[in-house]
Structure formats: C-alpha cells, structure tokens
Amino acid sequence: MKLFNTMTRQKEEFKPIKDGEVSMYVCGPTVYNYFHIGNGRTFLVFDTIRRYFEYRGYKVNFIQNFTDIDDKMIKKANEENITVKELGDRFIHEYYKDADGLNIKRATANPRATEYMDEIIQFVKDLIDKGYAYEVNGDVYFSTKQFKEYGKLSGQNLDDLQAGARISVDERKKDPMDFAIWKSEKPGEPSWNCPWGKGRPGWHIECSCMAHKLLGDTIDIHAGGADLVFPHHENEIAQSEARNGKTFANYWMHSAYLNINNKKMSKSLNNFFTTREILEKYDAEVIRLFMLSAHYRTPLNFSDDLLQSAKASNERLYNAIGNLERLLDEVKVDKVTENEKEYVKNLESYKEKYIEKMDDDFNTADAISVIFDLVKDINTNINTESSKELVEYSLELIRELGKPLGILQKSTMLDLNAEIEKLIEQRQQARKDKDWALADKIRDDLKARGIVLEDTPQGVRWKREQ
C-alpha cells in the first residue's frame, strides 16, 4: 500500500511502526460553531482512509481531537454570555450529530484540550528547560531558530518564511517567526495556574500534547486539511521533535480544499454551507459518493448540480442492488453451475482492481469507477437463469466494495421506492393543475435517475432501466 507523504512530497510504501496496527491522529474541529461541509470533506476523507485500513485487516487507533479553548471560542462565549465550557459542550454534541449524519465512524478517542492541561503545562516546561522556549511576562514562545529543521514540512526555510511573513511586530519575541505556546491571563478568559503565572495554552501545543499522550513519541500518520500544513502542523513538528528528540509522525497526509466558485470554502470568506444544511437536502451516502468522486488531494468544486449527479449515481447503484434482491426470489437454481465458475472469477477480478486502486494512495475516484464497471457487468450478465449462489455473491461483492467508502450499506430499497412514489404523486398533482413544465421536469429528473414512467389507463407505473 502506498500513500502520499506531504513531508517527502512523494508516494511511499506504508510501513507501520507495529505490524498490523495503525496509529492515526487527525486534527479535529474548534467547537465554537457547526462545522461547514469543507471541514466535512476532511473528516469524511480520513474516515474513509481509516475504514480502508480496517478493510485490509489493520487495527486502527484513530484519534481526533476537539479544540475547546481558543480565541474564537472565548469571543463567541462572551457574546452569548456563557462559559467556554458550556459552548464547547454544546458544539461537541452538535459535531457528533453531524458526523454521525455523514456516516463517519466514531474515533477511538476524541480528546478535549482542556482535559490535558497538566500534561500541556509539563510539555511547555520541558521545552523551556531544553532551551527551545522562553518566557516573557507570563507568555511563553517557541524559539524557531533553535529548531534547525523548522519549515521542513511546508518546504520553506526560516529565512524565506521571515521574508514573506505577515506577522505583527511583537517586541517581546526574539524572532518574528516565534510563536506562542502559552498565553498569559487576560480579563474575561479562562486560565490555569502554571509555574510562570496563570494563562492558557496556544493552539499548536494542544495537538502536540494530546497526540503524544495518546499515541506516543512517534505516530504512523498525522493528518488534516491542507490549510493546516503551515503553520499548525509545522509548529507541531517543531514542538514535538524538540521535546522528544524523535520523529513526530512517519507520514503526513493532507486533504485538498472543497471550493465554491473555485475559491476555498471558509467561514472567514463567508462562502460556506454547514454540514447540517447539506444533510437536510441530501442523504449521507450521496454526499460521500460526491466527496469521494475526486481524489482526496484534488480540490473539489461544490455545487448542487454535482450533488444531484451523485444522487442519480447512487440510485443507479441501488437499482442494481434492488434488481439482485428481487432475483433472489425468482431464480430456480441454488448452487453455482460449472458454466458460472468462470464468471465468478471475472467478478473476483473487480475486487482485485478495487484494491489496486485504493492501495495507490486511496484513489477513491478510480475505486468508484470499478464499482460502476462491476455493476454494469452484473446488470448485463445476471438474470433469472443465474444461480442463487451467484446472485448472492454479486450482491455481497457490491456491498463489500462500498463499505470502506461508507456507501451501499442500506438494507432495503423501501426508502428509495417511497421517494419515487412521492415524486410521482407530485407529478400527478402538477398534471391536474395543468403545470406541464413541473410535470415534465419531474419526469425528466426521474429518467435521469434511471426511473422510467409509463402513463396507463390504470394510472402511472414506473420501472427501473436495466
């Protein structure tokens, strides 16, 4: 299995620290609001990668943190006249609702920064003792010049970073690129006692500490969105390797942006949709199919048209599943026949192709294409003359290849059928109201989803295109 390592900028063979196990740390949300669908892409991508590792037999220790103390959280809590903890509790609860809605598996652990304050303070103290950090009037800064490899993840050296830095001048810093790992107490902010006075941690130190506490000095994979490469992950590396003297993570993985009109979706640009808003309009499997239709390192444009296309694709896949489910009641032969054995080998080749695509840096786009090729083959060659065993194997294979992607796992077609019936009722009403444009639109939309309507004297009938 090969994956692209941001650190080396190339694909590398994955070799875990411990055979059969993967330790994985993914930077989670700052819990001051609902997460937008751009963040959702990141969480969904690494959920899929975790699922695929498990499909290939690995035990995955998957850690995703909650940043529950932060400038944005303090500002929002003060605006609402509640405590930062109350705000964090609320939006952690809302995070789980939306992540569950996207069919994202629960992490092995979701540490909260505020639960690790003793460990964070010790981490800061160790950096000061080793000469990598210094205290000024209750603030503690990491000295980037002391860490000779600073910039290695983002591919920049310290001189270039300083030249291009847009950093406000702070006379207390020894160097403009030094960053705060502890911030002194300010009015209206939560604070904790420490040897250099009351205060709170900086964002970067929180992740370094939680990753170390839960996964050890060196972890297999550290991951997050592409926007975290610099400064967040760069600073994590500096802190962790300065303190522990060991490689922090063997592989760094980053997912590309979800764009709107070719611009990164972000709260700062106010060009975002919350995950909850999208879940109100689309099923989780449709969203997953859309998100995974592009490679995780490729920017993806977000649009209703693309989601509608994913919805139609999802229904075509479920049409195939529905056809196979019906065939189970119609076939007359139980066991695979001699003539079918060669065809079973043909079906098995799709699984091999799927694994080949996913083993190549988790190429979900190509893996989904393999599933569609498999379904087309099955639709063409399996019918009432096939054996029950072959139909069952075909059905199991489609679902098996869908599982690591978090799709094609629904047990029945009932929900889909009910939706189709509802649309037909709406079309009938439109015809009664002589709203021919709406009636034609519903018919055309259904046709695009593989559903053909037949107007008969007995009423409207529908069938799925083969």
From Swiss-Prot:
Assigned keywords, A-Z: Aminoacyl-tRNA synthetase, ATP-binding, Cytoplasm, Ligase, Metal-binding, Nucleotide-binding, Protein biosynthesis, Zinc
Protein localization: Cytoplasm
InterPro entries: Cys-tRNA-ligase (IPR015803), Cys-tRNA-synt_Ia_DALR (IPR015273), Cys-tRNA/MSH_ligase (IPR024909), CysS_C (IPR056411), Rossmann-like_a/b/a_fold (IPR014729), tRNA-synt_1_cat_dom (IPR032678), tRNAsynth_Ia_anticodon-bd (IPR009080)
Record's keyword annotation contains Ligase: yes
Binding site for ATP: K267
Residues bound to Zn(2+): C27, C207, H232, E236
Main location, first listed in the record: cytoplasm
Coiled-coil parts of chain: none
Protein family membership: Belongs to the class-I aminoacyl-tRNA synthetase family.
Subunit note: Monomer.
Protein name: Cysteine--tRNA ligase
